[in-house]
Structure formats: structure tokens, C-alpha cells
């Protein structure tokens, strides 16, 4: 992960020259198939907040070509994902993603969150979220709170036990930034979470 988005690089044998492969913007991706016995071909599955799971074919050149894509059951045109960084109460900087149609001004905004058990919240496509929320012209925010695994074990350990309150401070910093940037008013914001995220909200 590089700033919570997947980075995949090709390394040339012998020279060890590294070339980063071009993935969808703000994507989660992983290599799903590769075998030196089958040649230099490999396959990558990638998705983002606005792109459903896509199967990409790669080879030794480093180029990726789309082979197949899962259907999107809502209109993604006009939708964009941005990443912003905020500063929490103790000075720690953390990122969040916001997805929506930024031409519409302040809109109802749903903010998620988890911040626990070293679980990394990476970009992911959801038809349910798209149909029920994004297609209606609203914003969705995914914060990468401490307690998760986005930046390694220390990102998790910073907020355990007596420091647990810092997760709420992280979340508060994100909410304040959403308002400061004009994406939503306080009255337009709702927060949600499940499991550990339910304790957060």
C-alpha cells in the first residue's frame, strides 16, 4: 500500500529496475495468477470506489490491459474520488477518501470508520452503496483511522488501551475537515459503522 492505495511494480531480472504498473485511480488490487512455467503473463484483479472488480492481463512489458469487468449497476459518470489528509488532536496526520459528484456543492455525506484490529480499509466498489447513496448525488467518506493496519503495526498500537480515545479524535478531525472544505454542513453528515466501527459511531 502507498497512502492506502495498492501499488504493484515490475522488477527487471538482472538490472532490478523497478517500473510501477498503471492501476485504476485509488484502487485496491492483487495478483490473482502468475506462473513462470506459463510464460511472463500474469493477472491482476483491481477495483476502486467507482470501478467494479476488473481483471487485468499483464506481461513482462509492464503493460496492463483490461480483460473483463464486473457490472456496475449504477451510473458512475461524474463520480470522482479524492484523498485528503487531516491532523488529529495529537498531531498525527491521517488520510480519508471522499467519493461523489463534486460539481453539486455541499451534499448529504455518509462517513464510515473502523479503526481497529489492524484491519485496513482500502478502496472498494459497492453496488449497494452506489445505488442507495452515490447515485442520489451524495458523498461517501472512508477515513483511515488509527487502529487499522493501513500504515503497519504501529498505526494500530498507537490507539490501544489508554490511548483508545485517539480513534475518536481522528474521526472528529475528518468530520471537521469535510465541513471546512464545504463538502457538507454538520446537519448533512451521518456516521455509520459495524462491529468495531459500531463502537466508534
Model-derived regions: residue spans:
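Predominantly soluble domains enriched in secretory-pathway, periplasmic, or organellar proteins
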Residues: 25-29
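A short beta-strand motif characteristic of beta-propeller blades
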Residues: 17-23
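Short, solvent-exposed loop/turn segments at conserved positions within beta-propeller repeat blades
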Residues: 1-6, 48-51
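Short, solvent-exposed hinge/capping segments at secondary-structure junctions
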Residues: 8-10
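Serine-hydrolase catalytic core recognition
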Residues: 30-201
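Short loop/turn segments that connect beta-strands within beta-propeller blades
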Residues: 12-16, 59-61
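Beta-strand-connecting loop/turn residues
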Residues: 4-6, 16, 40
Amino acid at each position: 500500500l502507498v497512502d492506502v492505495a495498492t501499488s504493484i511494480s515490475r522488477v527487471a531480472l538482472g538490472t532490478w529496475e523497478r517500473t510501477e504498473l498503471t492501476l485504476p485511480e485509488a484502487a485496491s488490487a492483487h495478483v490473482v495468477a502468475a506462473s513462470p512455467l506459463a510464460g511472463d503473463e500474469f493477472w491482476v484483479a483491481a477495483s476502486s470506489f467507482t470501478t467494479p472488480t476488473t481483471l487485468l492481463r499483464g506481461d513482462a512489458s509492464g503493460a496492463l490491459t483490461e480483460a473483463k469487468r464486473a457490472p456496475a449497476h449504477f451510473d458512475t459518470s461524474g463520480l470522482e474520488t479524492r484523498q485528503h489528509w487531516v491532523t488529529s488532536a495529537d498531531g498525527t496526520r491521517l488520510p480519508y477518501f471522499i467519493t461523489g459528484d463534486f460539481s453539486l456543492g455541499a451534499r448529504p455525506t455518509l462517513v464510515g470508520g473502523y479503526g481497529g484490529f489492524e484491519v485496513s480499509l482500502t478502496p472498494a466498489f459497492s453496488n449497494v452503496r452506489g445505488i442507495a447513496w452515490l447515485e442520489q448525488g451524495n458523498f461517501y467518506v472512508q477515513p483511515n483511522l488509527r487502529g487499522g493496519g493501513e500504515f503497519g503495526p504501529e498505526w494500530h498500537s498507537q490507539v490501544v488501551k489508554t490511548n483508545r480515545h485517539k480513534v475518536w479524535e481522528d474521526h472528529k478531525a475528518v468530520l471537521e475537515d469535510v465541513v471546512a472544505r464545504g463538502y457538507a454542513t454538520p446537519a448533512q453528515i451521518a456516521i455509520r459503522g459495524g462491529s468495531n466501527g459500531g463502537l466508534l459511531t
